Amino acid sequence: MATPPPKGPRHVRDFARSAFVALALAATITGCFTGERPRFGCAPGESTGRIEIDEVLNRFECVATSTFTADYTVLTRLGDIDSAATVVQASSGRRSITINNVRFIYDNGRTLTCDLVSETCEAVINEARTSDLLLTSEFYAQSMASRLRVDAERRIGDPVASNVVLGGQPALCVAVPVTGGTKTYCALESGALARFDGSDLLVELTSYSSTPDEAAFGT
């Protein structure tokens, strides 16, 4: 018989980090698949069987075709930690994701994880740098797509769709009831996350522009 894991704040935090990293790894191999609902040259993955969920998934899974600058506030509920994040997605797959003082850069085959305070970088994407916040460089779309697919399978009731305005932009939302509460996912037409409200995180869009901020690629 397996010995149950010890309980306590440290072990809860370690479990949360491990679970989030697992979702992040799933997100990194999730892309756009050939399907029946094409959108701007990209088609989402397999249908969940509920259009309310699929329409939001469609946006998340096809974010790669969009260019934008998006600012977010983040609350990591475990530890009650407030953070700020900025995502810049430019053409040719160039991306910059800044979470507090950590910047992840994907730039024409070059990858960097930089500390903006010490002005030092490592030539890899080191997701561990923000694991204490339960955030990865994919938090703004692909991580959310992976989470939403898991919640679609685990839901205990009907999803509810809604339309809201967040960060001055119209967004499509779906609320999914799961054991322990309801999780809400909202996405912009571009595919960028507009809001996520779950038991571990609250992420909200505060401002948005369709123009990529090239300064965000600086280190």
Model-flagged regions — what are they?
Residues 86-141, 193, 201, 205:
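An acidic-aromatic
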Residues 146-160:
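A short, amphipathic edge element
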Residues 48-56, 69-72, 121-132, 194-195:
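Extracellular/mature segments of secreted proteins
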Residues 31-33, 39-46, 61-63, 113-115, ...:
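Sequence contexts marking disulfide-bonded cysteines in secreted/extracellular proteins
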Residues 84-90, 103-105, 156-165, 185:
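Short, exposed beta-strand/loop patches in secreted or surface proteins that constitute
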Residues 2, 8, 13-94, 215, ...:
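N-terminal leader/targeting segments and the immediate start of mature chains
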Residues 162-219:
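Gly/Pro-enriched, hydrophobic low-complexity segments
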Residues 63-73, 90-97, 166-175, 190-195:
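Short, hydrophobic/aromatic-rich segments at coil-to-beta transitions
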